Amino acid sequence: MDTVGSVKRQGTQRVGFLLMDQFTLVSLSSAIDPLRVANSLSDVELYRWCLIGAGEEEQISSDGVRVKLDHTLTDEIELDLVIVV
């Protein structure tokens, strides 16, 4: 059985989280946290993520929290996976 340290690595996976209007913070944190934990258990960076939205600089969650975006929909970025939140 493979362990975290023995899994064959194919490079850092680039994950984009597309934040919809009124997204829920619990969904976002539930999606990011396993990636963060995997990185902390590994000797290398397995995942890198960014936040994407339609707004200019921030997206507002369903409970009114403003989240700073890393990119907007018009930015050209290379990702391996996009998760819609």
Language model features: what each stretch is:
Residues 1-85:
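Extended, subdomain-level signal for the structured scaffold at the beginning of enzyme domains
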